[in-house]
């Protein structure tokens, strides 16, 4: 039995307060017709919002009970990961102990493992007027779980805009369709696949289709950017292009491979079962922004998730670089602080500051000097030191010139002879 810090009375009182907040909002507040009345958003009408409000208020006690339950379950999952993936001698803090980062599975592995271990009816009201509390967190943490990798898989949270340009999702390219990408994002939060909201999953898939990135908010030298565009087309665009489904492996780019290897056979089957269980209505359909009927719950196999479980098929996607100015730090594990350091590999620091909000417009990234940590830590509790010597933190890769499609492509812009070209390329990347 596990102690939960909640009671049916607290849950009911919280549900009533949230319902009052919902009722206080005018019609159209949650689903503005200007956005959700378009074909790509299921032709939502004000009546849809009325129904959604009623459904949420009805289910609030159960949702809050599950959330309260999940606090203890997540704690058990985190403790399990701390002694497995993050238990090595040079292991980083959980999720990198850093802002904007997470475990390589997005915490999905341990959440699905917890869901499997949950006794039926856990955290639901019982005849005695309390909540069922039978989950054994100690036994769960002490059990063997081959699904969890024995190494840290630190991951920067990727951008999600302009999904229509991306054939593959997740850093390892294991998920294709936007609908399933959203399932993957929801499951670590919801935990129980049967509670996934399919309608909202379709809405979000369409919302992200064509959603533009924020424009670079500082001045740009447009003459320099025009010159940089030509350099980008000659050296970068061959990989960083829409609908590129190539998986680039270690021998190609030399990047830390921990995140690419997050899926083993056991984890893949856990994911596949969780995804399929999430699509609990085989007849569910939604319309894409082009009006096409989509029935995701009738899909199976690699249309849902790809088994990237062996080194031969593991690697990383080369994403479209839209809004790249806002994605710092760079690479899948956030190991490169600025675009300048990405393009001048010899300059990459072994340690740098994460979590600062002061922006470096020359190098395109955030202020990174660890020496200033003590000066600002009291007012910026999110500041941490990123150490490339930690497991999964290597800042290697994208650091040597490559021949692609029979032509040499420059990735390393070190040296005074490339100083002007480097400035032009960085200036252009600000406009993406």
Swiss-Prot record:
Domain spans labelled Cytochrome c: 223-432
Gene3D superfamilies: Cytochrome c-like domain
Protein name listed in UniProt: Uncharacterized protein y4iM
Protein's organism: Sinorhizobium fredii (strain NBRC 101917 / NGR234)
Keywords: Electron transport, Heme, Iron, Metal-binding, Plasmid, Transport
GO molecular function, one term: electron transfer activity
Keyword Transport among UniProt keywords: yes
InterPro entries, per database record: Cyt_c-like_dom, Cyt_c-like_dom_sf, Cytochrome_c_Peroxidase/MauG
Residues annotated for heme c binding in this entry: 236, 239-240
């Amino acid at each position: 039995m596990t102690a939960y810090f909640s009671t049916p009375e607290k849950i009911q009182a919280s549900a009533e307060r949230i319902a009052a907040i919902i009722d206080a909002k005018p019609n159209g507040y949650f689903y503005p017709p200007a956005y959700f009345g378009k074909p790509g958003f299921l032709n939502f009408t004000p009546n849809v919002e009325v129904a959604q409000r009623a459904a949420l208020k009805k289910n609030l006690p159960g949702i809050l009970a599950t959330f309260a339950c999940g606090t203890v379950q997540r704690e058990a999952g985190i403790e399990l990961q701390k002694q497995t993936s993050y238990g090595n001698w040079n292991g980083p803090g959980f999720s990198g102990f850093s802002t904007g980062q997470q475990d390589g599975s997005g915490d999905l592995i341990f959440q699905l493992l917890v869901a499997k271990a949950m006794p039926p009816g856990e955290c639901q009201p019982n005849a005695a007027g309390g909540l069922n509390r039978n989950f054994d967190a100690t036994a769960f943490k002490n059990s063997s779980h081959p699904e969890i990798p024995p190494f840290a898989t630190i991951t920067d949270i990727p951008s999600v805009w302009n999904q229509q340009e991306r054939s593959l999702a997740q850093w390892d390219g294991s998920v294709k369709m936007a609908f399933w990408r959203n399932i993957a994002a929801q499951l670590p939060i919801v935990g129980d696949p049967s509670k996934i909201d399919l309608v909202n999953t379709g809405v979000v898939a369409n919302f992200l289709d064509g959603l533009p990135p924020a424009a670079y908010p500082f001045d740009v030298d447009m003459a320099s950017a025009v010159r940089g565009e030509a350099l980008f087309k000659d050296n970068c665009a061959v990989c960083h292009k829409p609908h590129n489904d190539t998986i680039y492996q270690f021998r190609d780019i030399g990047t830390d491979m921990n995140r690419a290897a997050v899926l083993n056979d056991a984890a893949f089957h856990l994911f596949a079962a969780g995804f399929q269980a999430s699509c609990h209505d085989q007849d569910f359909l939604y319309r894409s922004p082009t009006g096409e009927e989509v029935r995701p719950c009738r899909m199976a196999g690699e249309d849902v998730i790809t088994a990237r479980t062996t080194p031969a098929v593991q690697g990383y996607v080369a994403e479209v670089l839209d809004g790249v100015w806002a994605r710092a730090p760079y690479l899948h594990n956030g190991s490169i602080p600025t675009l300048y350091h990405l393009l001048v590999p010899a300059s990459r620091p072994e340690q740098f500051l994460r979590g600062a909000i002061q922006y470096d417009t020359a190098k395109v990234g955030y202020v990174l000097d660890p020496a200033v940590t003590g000066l600002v830590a009291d007012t910026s509790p999110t500041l941490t030191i990123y150490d490339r010597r930690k497991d999964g933190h290597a800042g290697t890769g994208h650091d040597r010139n490559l021949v692609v499609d029979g032509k040499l492509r420059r990735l390393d812009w070190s040296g005074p002879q490339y100083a002007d070209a480097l400035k032009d390329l960085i200036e252009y990347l600000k406009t993406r």
